[in-house]
Amino acid sequence: MRQFDISRRLAYYGFMELQVELLKLIQQIRFPLLDVLFQAITITAEELFFIVLAAWFLWCGNKQLGYRVGFAFLVSTVVNPMLKNSFRLERPIGIEGIEAQRLHTAEGFAFPSGHTQGAAAFWTGLMSFVRRPWMYRLGVSMIALVALSRMYLGVHWPVDVLGGAAAGIVTVLLMNKLFDLASRRKNKFLLLWAVLPLAVGLFLVEDKNYVQPFGALLGFWLGYLLEDRYLKVEVAAVWWRQGLKMAVGLLGLIGIRVGLKLLLGTVFPSDFMISNLIRYFFIGLWLTVGAPYVFRNCNIQYKKNE
């Protein structure tokens, strides 16, 4: 893959020194309570948080919202490591005067920030669907807070979070256009235009952070087609059925995530890309069609007489 040395360009124009000083300024306000707060904020832009919210939308809340936000978020998550491996900007970790926290979330290169890009894709997707003032305020606030948290924790440059926010927003705008086109033409196969081009990256980006979300995206798309063709489940239900669906669905999700990792680990090395692709493919499939199929056939789905 062609690489663009952004760090040299930024240094040439004097931006790196400016960014170092800005990070030091942000970290001057540090104290233990803020450490906890910003670590909690950054968790809202991580895999577990988004999976649980996607599950709720798809199983209990609003399927169409879940599909739109899910597709945009996954496409954005796939694009992020491709951009990182193209620009190859190093993180501020190790810079004198900057203290880094939560280092296990700071894998790979810096630009653009994956947490900020994910938050921007998720919340922009919600804002484009739920067009209410309170949602705009919440969405913009969450994107800004996640961006600030990554700088406060010392794992990203300001340019990283700005680039991440821009990439996430642009992805949502493009995916909304594609979704609208697929709806007008009543042809859900048009969504393949968002999936197939990204398959090329499997041969260019040797990064599990690319393979995993691509597997989930592929499973999500196939499950979307199968659910619409064969199930068409209603997500509305009384509160206890909603709780039961979430419990059963999330347990199934954990089983797939952990069970397949153990099973595939007996066949492939733990870091083998194909095993990650397969595992996340079934996670995407479970979210969209697997869990709804179980809900319907185990009589925990919506009942008309309730």
Regions flagged by a language model, labelled:
Residues W59, V79, A147-L148, L222, ...:
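Hydrophobic membrane-targeting signal helices
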Residues L53-A55, Y67, T77, I93-K261:
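Membrane-embedded catalytic cores of phosphoryl/pyrophosphoryl-handling enzymes
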Residues L58-C60, W123, W286:
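Tryptophan-centered motif/residue detector
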Residues K63-E90:
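Membrane helical hairpin/interfacial module
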Residues R2-F49, N80-G108, A236-V248, G252-I256, ...:
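N-terminal transmembrane-helix/juxtamembrane module of multi-pass inner/ER membrane proteins
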Residues L48-A72:
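Polybasic, low-complexity association/targeting segments
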